[in-house]
Every structure is written in structure tokens, then in C-alpha cells.
Amino acid sequence: MRVFITGGNRGLGLQLVKVFHENGHIVYPLVRTEVAVTQLKQMFSCRCFPILADLSLDESTEQIKNQLEEYTEYIDLVINNAGITGKETEVLHTNSEELTDLFNIHCLGVIRAVKGTYVALAKSDHPRIINVSSRLGSLHKMANKEFPQGQFSYSYRIAKAAQNMLTLCLQQEFENKGIRVTAIHPGKLKTDIGAFDANMTPAEGAKNIYDWVIDSNVDASGKFIEPGVGELKW
């Protein structure tokens, strides 16, 4: 399998690169800096082809497309993992800059990555897109008051809820083209952007996602999944 993974140099993204690579797959981790490219090349001597682009910028679409063309004719799986966290948990302290920054990465960044990988993805026999979402983007959970006030940022919850809608939009558009699109909550991960109640390492989360990708025989397109747990409500 040929796998494109955004945010591939740290946290969950790096662990996804590792687990797919360790199991014999070819990985194309997207990173923002030359330093990260060098580090990945040193870490993985073969079957790893770092892609250099900044998903916060529109030009990343062409950069992704052009670099992928140098390495491969097709991609089987796109994992949109790149993300940043918010800070403010009260509306009076929430500012437009923070909201804009998170929307830019979690939503526009996904759109840029999908556009950049589309030509290669469409050539796969079994193309898939996984958007790494979060339980915090679930309107159902929010409406049921599962998230204590003051514990989670406005901007992250809003950005992930918007990303979930984007997942469904992509699924609807790509359904007749054979491209499956799924949102995945990786678990409560202990990462730089992890929640206060995090209880799982990035490596554990990556392994759960990998096992689900490999073992799942059910079409989960248009679904919100927590690997090892089941389907979540939007």
C-alpha cells in the first residue's frame, strides 16, 4: 500500500509513518521543513519519501502534486492527520486569529491535501481518505454535555466539527468515483495537542488505526469511527 500522511514528523503522524513502514508499506509523509525531511530520511532508509509543503498555504496543493509525481503514479490511502490546538475556553477570550488558524489547518489544509493528492489517489484500485478527527468535533457529544465547560478550546471544537462536515461533503462527492472517505477519532492521545484526560500514547493510537485500516472489511465511508471501539455519532 502507498500511504500519504500529513503531519508526518511528530506525534500521531510520525507513529503512523512508523507503523505503516514497519509493515512493508511505502509512505509519503508531509512535513513543513527541510530539517524534518532530513530527519525522516535518516530515520527510514527506504520506502519513505518525504513531501515538503506547508498546508496553511494554497501553494501546497501544487507542491504536493508535483512532488508525488516524482515518486509514484498512485496513492492508495491519504491520511489527513496534521493539526494544531487552540487555547481559549471562553468566548470572551476567544479571538479571530486563533479560530482562523485552526480552521485553516483542520479544514482548508485537508482540502489542499486532497486536491494535491487527487490525481494520484484516483489511479488506485482501492482509494481511501481518512481524516483524523476528534470526539471534540461531535455535535452529538457536545449536545449531551460530555465535554466539561472550561476544559476544551472553542477553536479546536469548532474546527473539528467543521472538518467532520467536510468529511461528509467529500464522501458525497467521491462516492460514485469509488473513493471512500472516513473520519477517525484516534482516541485520547498524549500529544502536544492532547486533551487533559488523554490516556493513550500516539504509538497505541497509530497501531489501532493501522489495524483498523488493514482488518476492516466493512465499508466505513461516510462514518465517524473510533478504531477498537466502534462508530461515533456525528
Stretches found by the model and what they are:
Residues N23-T38:
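Conserved glycine-rich Rossmann-like NAD(P)H-binding loop of the short-chain dehydrogenase/reductase
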Residues F44-E59:
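Rossmann-fold cofactor-recognition segment
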Residues A161, N176, A183-I184, A195-W234:
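C-terminal helical subdomain
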Residues N9-K18:
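N-terminal Rossmann NAD(P)H-binding glycine-rich loop of SDR-like oxidoreductase domains
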Residues G83-I84, E88, L92-F103, A122, ...:
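Catalytic loop of short-chain dehydrogenase/reductase
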Residues S56-Y71:
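Conserved Rossmann-fold cofactor-binding substructure of NAD(P)-dependent oxidoreductases
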